[in-house]
Each structure stands twice: as structure tokens, then as C-alpha cells.
Amino acid sequence: KALYAPFDATFPNQNQTRNKAVDTAPCEWYRRVY
């Protein structure tokens, strides 16, 4: 899951919580991470 790569490394348990927030705009979030 590249979408949660940054969170998976630091917050593997919070990756699920962020997933819901990213669900609203996965495309925009993906561009912000990279």
C-alpha cells in the first residue's frame, strides 16, 4: 500500500485511521505525499 507508506513506517496502527481521512481525496493526498 504505497498510499500509507509514510504512515506505515511511523504509524502502522494509525494507517487505518488515516485511510478513512484519505478516502475523501486519495488522489490529492497521494500527490501531497510525493
UniProtKB/Swiss-Prot annotation:
Against SUPFAM superfamilies, the record matches this protein to:
Cytochrome c oxidase subunit h
Posttranslational mods: The N-terminus is blocked.
Keywords assigned by UniProt, alphabetized: Membrane, Mitochondrion, Mitochondrion inner membrane
Q: Which domain of life is it from?
A: Eukaryota
Its membrane topology is listed as: Peripheral membrane protein
Please list the GO biological process terms of this entry.
oxidative phosphorylation
Q: Which GO terms describe its cellular component?
A: mitochondrial inner membrane
Give, as in the UniProt entry, the pathway in which the protein acts: Energy metabolism; oxidative phosphorylation
Chief location category: mitochondrion
Q: Where in the cell is it found?
A: Mitochondrion inner membrane
* Function of the protein: Component of the cytochrome c oxidase, the last enzyme in the mitochondrial electron transport chain which drives oxidative phosphorylation. The respiratory chain contains 3 multisubunit complexes succinate dehydrogenase (complex II, CII), ubiquinol-cytochrome c oxidoreductase (cytochrome b-c1 complex, complex III, CIII) and cytochrome c oxidase (complex IV, CIV), that cooperate to transfer electrons derived from NADH and succinate to molecular oxygen, creating an electrochemical gradient over the inner membrane that drives transmembrane transport and the ATP synthase.
Subunit composition and interactions? Component of the cytochrome c oxidase (complex IV, CIV), a multisubunit enzyme composed of 14 subunits. The complex is composed of a catalytic core of 3 subunits MT-CO1, MT-CO2 and MT-CO3, encoded in the mitochondrial DNA, and 11 supernumerary subunits COX4I, COX5A, COX5B, COX6A, COX6B, COX6C, COX7A, COX7B, COX7C, COX8 and NDUFA4, which are encoded in the nuclear genome.
Which family does the record assign?
Belongs to the cytochrome c oxidase subunit 6B family.
Task: Please give the name of this protein.
Answer: Cytochrome c oxidase subunit 6B
In its UniProt entry, the species of origin is given as Thunnus obesus (Bigeye tuna)
Give the organism's phylogenetic lineage. Eukaryota, Metazoa, Chordata, Craniata, Vertebrata
